[in-house]
Amino acid sequence: MSNPIYNKHIISISDLSRSELELIVSTANDLKQNPRPDLLKNKVVASCFFEASTRTRLSFETAVQRLGGSVIGFPDSGNTSLGKKGETLADSVQVISSYCDAFFMRHNQEGAARLASEFSSAPVINGGDGSNQHPTQTLLDLFSIYETQGTLEKLQVAFVGDLKYGRTVHSLTQALSLFDCEFHFIAPAALSMPDYIIDELKAKGCKYTLHDHLDGVLPNLDILYMTRVQKERFDETEYQHLKSSFILNANMLEGVKENLKVLHPLPRIDEITTDVDSTPYAYYFQQAKNGVYARQALLALVLTNEFGDK
C-alpha cells in the first residue's frame, strides 16, 4: 500500500499535494465511520504547546488516545526548561523527539515548526506557528467542506474578518486553490489578505475578489468562513475599532443557497450571533468535532502504512 505521507513532517499545507490532501480527507471519513482503537498501540506522541490552545490541543490528544496511542508533553512552556531555564527550541526538540514517535507542536513564532523539523528525530506536525500556518486546522476544514458539499471542486468560498493575522485562512486558501475554487475576501483594509497569498492565487490563475462588506456576496456562496479579530495581536483601541467590522446574524442568511455552510475556526466572540446557531447553515460546532477525525487521519498516515493507495 502506497502512503506518501508516512514519516513526513507536516509543517505547511503547501507541503502537501492535492492527492495527499484527498488521501487525508478520505482517511478521516474512513476513521469517522470505522473507529480503529488499536491503530497506534505502543506509539508515543509528544503534544508540546509553547502557545496556549484549547480545541487544537484537546482534539489532538483525543485523536491519539482514540487510536490507542499515548501522549506526553505540556500545555504551556512556562514550566519547562525552555521557559524557565532559557533552553533553546532546537535543544528542546532534539531531546523530546527522542522520547516519541511523532512531535505535535504549537508556537507563537512564525517558522518555529520548520526549525523544529530540522532538529527532530520524529516527524513534526505543526499545530500553528504565530500568524503563519495552521495545517491541521485546514485538514479539518477540508474534511468539513467535503462532508457538507460532497466535493472540494469549484466551490464559491468567502473568508470574512481577520484575513491578515488569521493563519487558518492562509492555509485553507492555499489548499482550496488546488481545487479550482473561487474566493471572496471580505475584510477591512487593515486586516486584508497578505500579498503573498494573493500572488500565489494569481500565479495559479485562481479567481478571487476583494470586498469591504458582506452585502451582495452571500447568495452565491457554498462556504462562508468567518473569523474573529484576534485580540492578542492588537492594542485595545485598535481591537475595539476592528472587532465589530463584520458580524453575521440569522436575518442575513435569508435567500442563501440551501447547501451553504457557515464555518469558523473558533473561538467566536461576537462575529456570529447566537441566532445563527439554530439555522441549518451553522456547521462550526460539527467542524470543531471533525478536528478529532482529521487529526486521527494525519496521525494514522504519518505513523502507519495502514492507509493509502492500494
UniProtKB/Swiss-Prot annotation:
Purpose: Catalyzes the condensation of carbamoyl phosphate and aspartate to form carbamoyl aspartate and inorganic phosphate, the committed step in the de novo pyrimidine nucleotide biosynthesis pathway.
Gene Ontology, cellular component aspect: cytosol
Pfam families (UniProt xref): OTCace, OTCace_N
Pathway: Pyrimidine metabolism; UMP biosynthesis via de novo pathway; (S)-dihydroorotate from bicarbonate: step 2/3
Subunit architecture: Heterododecamer (2C3:3R2) of six catalytic PyrB chains organized as two trimers (C3), and six regulatory PyrI chains organized as three dimers (R2).
EC number: 2.1.3.2
Gene: pyrB3
UniProt KW keywords: Pyrimidine biosynthesis, Transferase
Protein residues bound to carbamoyl phosphate: R55, T56, R106, H134, Q137, L266, P267
UniProt feature coiled coil, ranges: none
Chemical reaction(s) catalysed: carbamoyl phosphate + L-aspartate = N-carbamoyl-L-aspartate + phosphate + H(+)
InterPro entries registered for this protein in UniProt: Asp/Orn_carbamoyltranf_P-bd, Asp/Orn_carbamoylTrfase, Asp/Orn_carbamoylTrfase_sf, Asp_carbamoyltransf, Asp_carbamoyltransf_Asp/Orn-bd
Family affiliation: Belongs to the aspartate/ornithine carbamoyltransferase superfamily. ATCase family.
Protein name: Aspartate carbamoyltransferase catalytic subunit 3
Enzyme class: transferase
Cystine connections: none
GO molecular function: amino acid binding; aspartate carbamoyltransferase activity
A GO biological process held by the record: 'de novo' pyrimidine nucleobase biosynthetic process
